[in-house]
């Protein structure tokens, strides 16, 4: 069931028994799990994966869907994870060395 004036880009996949409200917009390659409800005026960014119900009047992106500001911040951090991991390991070694000095 898809509400009126809802638009979807290419390659949107919607599993069975999902109800989608009116005035929604879905970017390309959005995937929606079955047996859930998506409220009116929900905007989903491209390649979002929706595992559960979404209340209306929201703009979301990602898997699981989140507010755009949080999504883009997490993507920026994700790119730096290898360096952050290396720094964390170095800090752990330094802490252990300092503990052993006591």
Task: State the predicted function of each range.
Residues 66-102:
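Long, leucine- and charge-enriched amphipathic alpha-helices
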């Amino acid at each position: 069931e898809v509400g009126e004036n809802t638009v979807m880009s290419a390659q949107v996949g919607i599993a069975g028994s999902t109800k989608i409200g009116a005035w929604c917009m879905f970017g390309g390659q959005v995937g929606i799990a079955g047996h859930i409800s998506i409220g009116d005026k929900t905007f989903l960014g491209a390649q979002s994966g929706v595992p559960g119900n979404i209340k209306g009047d929201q703009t979301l992106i990602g898997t699981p869907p989140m507010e755009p500001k949080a999504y883009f911040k997490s993507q920026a951090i994700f790119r730096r994870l290898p360096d952050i991991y290396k720094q964390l390991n170095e800090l752990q070694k330094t802490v252990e060395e300092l503990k052993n000095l006591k």
